[in-house]
Structure formats: C-alpha cells, structure tokens
Amino acid sequence: YNPVVMSYLLVTQDNVLWFVRKGAVPEEDTETEDSFHELTADGVSLQEYSDVGLALSNLVDGSYIKALFVDPSTLNYDLYSILNENASQFVVMGASPVALRKSVKNEVEVAGMREAHLEDGVAVERFLHWLETSLQAGDAINEYEASVKLHEFRSGIEGFRGESFETISAYGPNAALPHYVTPEEGSAELYTEGLYLCDSGGQYLFGTTDITRTVPLGPCSQLEKEDYTLVLKGHI
C-alpha cells in the first residue's frame, strides 16, 4: 500500500548512491524499470539494498570526510553503530532537510489534497448509499463484500492507484477490535441493525486519503447510542 520504495540514499560531493532492492521488481513492471533507467541516465548510481552498510564503512574510512549529516529518527541501530564506532567525530545529527521541506506543502500539493478528499468523499458517500439501500432491499452482504464494493467506487475516480491501506470493514463486535482484519472467507454478515465501521483510504496521483466512518445500519441499542454520541462529542 506504500507507493514509496524502502531504500537508502547516500549523497556525497561527487556521487548519488541509491540502495534499493532493484531485483524485487517484477519483470512485467516496465514502468518502474523505465524509472530506474532514467535515474541512471541522470547520474544516480543504483546499488544493492544490503550493501549500504559496507558502503558507509568504506566512506567513513576515507580521510577526506569532514562531515556526514544523518537523521537519527530514520537511521537503524546497525548503521548508527558503524558511524558511532568509526566516524563519531564527523557525524552531524539533525532532522532531514528533505523531510522538513516536504512538511511544508506548496499550492499544487494543497490543491491535490483537497481534490483527493472531495473525490474520495463522493466515493464513500456512494458506497454508504449503496450499502443502506441494498440492506433495506434484503440483499445479503458481508463485511468483505462491502469492502470490495467500496474499492469499485474508488476505482472509478481518475488517478486512482489503489487503497492507501487495507480496508477495515467491521460490523458489530468486530468494530471494537483495533486494526481488525476483514477475512475474505467467513466474514460477518451485515444486518439492518447495529453499528458498522469502515476505515479505509485511497491513493491518487494528486493525493492520499484516510477516512473512518461508523454508521448505524438500523435500530441501535441504548448503549450503542450513548457510546456513539460520546465519541462524536469528543471529536467535535
């Protein structure tokens, strides 16, 4: 669900080395292969992901190193140990300037975020309308089938690239389970009573969403009404 590849980037005065699992890309994924070729043509050296420790050791062994900037919040213990043992006098710790700049959204990014939430919100509303009318008509629907239908509504949006995480489609007691995994086989049937929770999101070329809605599918118990109201008041 994460469209950003897990990797390391080492930038020196003369080179840019990208440590990535290039071999994990399926042969039929020509779009990614084309991206690799473009990066190579631009001077980025593609390296094996597992070689980052060795490259870092070789780098700090060089006498020409005067400073090495790292972000401790994204550095694992193994790489930190290499630096701490061999180059502690050169290491400068601080927040990544890349992350800091990305945290401030430009006008295009802000517009994309708004468009994503508007488009995605329409898809979710269409889904909830379908769910309500289908159940009232007597159609049999379970948790997993509901999540599949939501995917169909989202996939009709131009620029849709898939879910931003696995959809949590949970009915009744299942909705009380943190990070409930909706089973493809044997998921709970939905009825015209009680509460239904749907936690989902979409990846679009212009933005990413994460939306949770808990809705009554029909009459609710007094306890469900009280709990629902208290949670709503807490959010407001």
Descriptions of predicted regions:
Residues 1-236:
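Active-site neighborhoods and metal-handling regions in enzymes and metal-associated proteins
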